Amino acid sequence: MAEEKKTTRKKIQAADKMNKIMADYFHGLNEAATTGKRKVAWCTSVGPAELLRAMDFDVYFPENHSAMLGATRMSTDLIPAANAIGYSPDICSYLTADIGAYLKGITPLVKAYPGIESVPKPDVLVYNTNQCRDVQDWFAWYSKKFDVPSI
């Protein structure tokens, strides 16, 4: 029988700094959304984030939240909630996982960043359909839920 090799992991040198950067980012978004001291814009991955930052918005990317849902193995429990309200199982799982998480009131941000209870409430939703057409429907849904403009 072949001898099993033990896998060892070497911590990436920048991990602690990156963890702090991400914690500061999400806590900043949370503070902006809960206090109203700063405006929050949701933006798609190839949206005009630089322009939004230049207009003094704190920018949140729902696709990153969906990636967290997938990485934490939560998506499979959340996608059916979006399917149940009419979203096809054949469309973007980022959309359906994220909407499912909203419908169920859960997010991995709670565990990753103590003190954060939900995704930040947007003041505006800004998208670009260059990467996919589904983001228009995704942001339109949230526009109705949060009663904010989607452009």
Predicted regions and their residues:
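An N-terminal assembly and electron-transfer interface module characteristic of large anaerobic redox
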Residues: 1-151
